[in-house]
């Protein structure tokens, strides 16, 4: 996948931080790419940063409709005062307030994946959703910025699964994603947080 990185869209892929990435915003992060266009840049959300704050404490009407753990996730360092929701609808459903993401692989996402307008009354959309997660903020890169970071060895670009986006144990996601790749990346999953303690 990385050989043609400059012309392939990364929408729907995972960005998994390599051990070289020491920025505290992204240390051992797993980012799901929501949108990637050559002219406008890239937008994604960090999947493995659950907060202690319940969704119901911030968005009272949505609290009972989100996947477990039912907490707000820190989606990234940009726009942290705004919520962004990802959801998978039930079979054949395209509810009001749900917008499909472009370029989603039908094998991985047979029901689709999209965003939910959190201003939509939950009673109009929630019953048609299979899974939903709410993020405060997002990760963003200007045009060409993410490709440069990938070339510098900051990110692994890997395929995403539904379980990655909606996993019940998000804190262990970085290691799980790397382990399932096998080979060298499975070895990277065993790196200690502080290599000097090894």
Curated annotation (Swiss-Prot):
InterPro entries: AlgH-like (IPR003774). GO terms for cellular component: cytosol. Pfam families: DUF179. Gene3D superfamilies: VC0467-like. HAMAP family: UPF0301 (MF_00758). Belongs to the UPF0301 (AlgH) family. This is UPF0301 protein Tfu_2389.
